[in-house]
């Protein structure tokens, strides 16, 4: 089962926490769809800024959005000009007062989502999939990861039939709940179709093993 389930969802409440931090008795569905709309918009709008994750906190008619990114300068802009533009665009999607908090991801090589997006970008630039996977695995392990597994699925190398190839180095214990495993998914839009890229990154164990 550990092979199939989303590693972050599997560990929620154990060592991982939710990306949407709010509680609603009435308009739960409405707020959930609003969250999805905001996330999709930000992902598209800030695609080249290396956005790792987006956290949304809500309280009393206000929405605080935490954006974790590898390139905060691109989002903030000169004297915060870009942030103001972004706030106005987000205000159109929600009737709440929006606060933006930009946080830098100091080691993008240790962030599964950013690694997946990096591999996807390489595939779009027609770099051989094995080379792209190997390069990312090597650089991630160099930065101190305990293990990584990258899976590419689709018409690899323009082949007639789609297939799945994966490359792993180190340990990736999917069943161990105390194992801090980061998960990222990205899609490479190539001339042959879409290639899916999944990354599982093992950073070490969080809770000490019970004696």
UniProtKB/Swiss-Prot annotation:
Keywords: Ribonucleoprotein, Ribosomal protein, RNA-binding, rRNA-binding. SUPFAM superfamilies: Prokaryotic type KH domain (KH-domain type II), Ribosomal protein S3 C-terminal domain. Pfam families: KH_2 (PF07650), Ribosomal_S3_C (PF00189). GO terms for molecular function: mRNA binding; rRNA binding; structural constituent of ribosome. One of its GO terms (cellular component) is cytosolic small ribosomal subunit. Residues 38-106 form the KH type-2 domain. Binds the lower part of the 30S subunit head. Binds mRNA in the 70S ribosome, positioning it for translation. Belongs to the universal ribosomal protein uS3 family. HAMAP family: Ribosomal_uS3_B. This is Small ribosomal subunit protein uS3. It comes from Citrifermentans bemidjiense (strain ATCC BAA-1014 / DSM 16622 / JCM 12645 / Bem) (Geobacter bemidjiensis). The lineage of its organism: Bacteria, Pseudomonadati, Thermodesulfobacteriota, Desulfuromonadia, Geobacterales.
